[in-house]
């Protein structure tokens, strides 16, 4: 059996800016974890992050700097990931 890697979407320029605006609009420029206001120019967070990240609306969320740092480096990284996944699932059910 052959397993195919999921295709990752990579956007640049206007397409990436438009996607960032859509994600910020969906999330009302608020961190989906703590509710803090986030500047609309701040790039969204990919979930999943790392090598599997993909520039897609249903895979991005707005995070404040603190929650973004915690998602990547904190003791509660797994908890934050689960909250993000739950939030995105509710958005696209």
Language model features by range: what are they?
Residues 50-66, 84-93:
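Short microdomains enriched in Cys/His and/or Lys/Arg
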Residues 32-62, 71, 75:
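Histidine-centered nuclease catalytic patch
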Residues 1-28, 35-41, 73, 77-93:
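A boundary/linker detector
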């Amino acid at each position: 059996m052959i397993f195919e890697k999921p295709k990752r979407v990579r956007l640049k320029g206007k397409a990436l800016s438009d996607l960032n605006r859509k994600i910020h609009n969906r999330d009302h420029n608020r961190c989906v974890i703590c509710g803090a206001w986030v500047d609309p120019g701040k790039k969204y967070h990919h979930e999943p992050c790392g090598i599997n990240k993909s520039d897609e609306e249903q895979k991005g969320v707005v995070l404040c700097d603190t929650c973004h740092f915690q998602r990547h480096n904190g003791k509660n990284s797994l908890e934050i990931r689960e909250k993000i996944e739950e939030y995105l699932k509710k958005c696209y059910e």
